[in-house]
């Protein structure tokens, strides 16, 4: 939330790595009553609607840096070199938070969204696909930062980028239903109506030649990082 970050006396340009992030978050947490927030970060809920943000998406960072440093491409080769970095960012999330860490087991993804949209937290970890959840803040108030974990060179890091690899079609269905489903999926990613719905109403990136560009401003921010030469 750029509005809250500015009210605290900072801009995104002040945050170029983990140490900067911690300094800013610690200060916001210490002044939360003055700033009218409940914490620097939204609650890092560990129920099924939220824990994937940290057990998979956040965990990708230390794994990526180990793959890069050791030239590996298999999870069997992971030694846990950057586990301390993983712990550092996680500890920051739950210490400079809107809630006591003891409550995280029951906190949900909707809780985090409500805290962010309700201007009770400055930072919220999620991706471009969550735009519809947070758009009520106003596009001008939405910014995106890389997830910093305290690794050398992370000032040149962009946003984490990933995608789902496939859609599933139930092969136990009738041949007619399978074909109808495949036809529908093709329509979704090639037709004007289908790509408009996915780009404008859902805010998705659609990586197909005939697809419409998304109007999601978070995707534009992600593209800006790439244009600046940041690793994404």
Region spans (language model):
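Extracytoplasmic/periplasmic substrate-recognition and gating elements
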Residues: 8, 136-201
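Beta->alpha turn/N-cap motifs
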Residues: 109, 126-131, 147, 163-165
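Short helix-initiation/N-cap motifs at beta->coil->alpha
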Residues: 16-22, 103-118
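Paired acidic/hydrophobic, glycine-rich loop segments that form the ligand-binding mouth/hinge
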Residues: 122-127, 143
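Aromatic-glycine-rich donor-binding/catalytic loop that engages nucleotide-sugar donors
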Residues: 3-14, 98-100
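Long, aromatic- and glycine/proline-rich binding clefts that accommodate carbohydrate-like moieties
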Residues: 198-232
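Extracytoplasmic/periplasmic solute-binding protein
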Residues: 22-75, 121
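Glycine-centered hinge/linker elements that transmit conformational signals in sensory
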Residues: 24-27, 71-106
């Amino acid at each position: 939330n750029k509005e809250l970050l500015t009210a605290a006396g900072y801009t995104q340009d002040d945050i170029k790595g983990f140490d900067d992030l911690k300094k800013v978050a610690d200060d916001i947490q210490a002044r939360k009553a003055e700033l009218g927030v409940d914490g620097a970060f939204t609650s890092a809920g560990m129920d099924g609607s939220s824990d994937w943000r940290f057990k998979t998406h956040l965990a990708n960072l230390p794994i990526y840096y180990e793959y890069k440093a050791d030239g590996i491409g298999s999870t069997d080769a992971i030694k846990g070199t950057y586990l301390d970095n993983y712990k550092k960012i996680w500890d920051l999330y739950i210490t400079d938070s809107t809630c006591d860490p003891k409550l995280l087991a029951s906190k949900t993804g909707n809780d985090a969204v409500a805290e962010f949209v309700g201007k009770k937290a400055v930072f919220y970890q999620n991706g471009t696909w969550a735009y519809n959840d947070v758009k009520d803040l106003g596009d001008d108030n939405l910014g995106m930062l890389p997830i910093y974990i305290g690794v050398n060179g992370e000032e040149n890091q962009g946003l984490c980028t990933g995608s789902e690899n496939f859609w599933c079609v139930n092969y136990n269905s009738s041949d007619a239903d399978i074909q109808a489903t495949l036809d529908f999926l093709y329509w979704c990613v090639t037709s004007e109506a289908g790509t408009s719905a996915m780009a404008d109403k859902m805010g998705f990136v659609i990586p197909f030649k005939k697809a419409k560009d998304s109007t999601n401003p978070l995707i534009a921010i992600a593209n800006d990082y790439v244009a600046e030469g940041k690793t994404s």
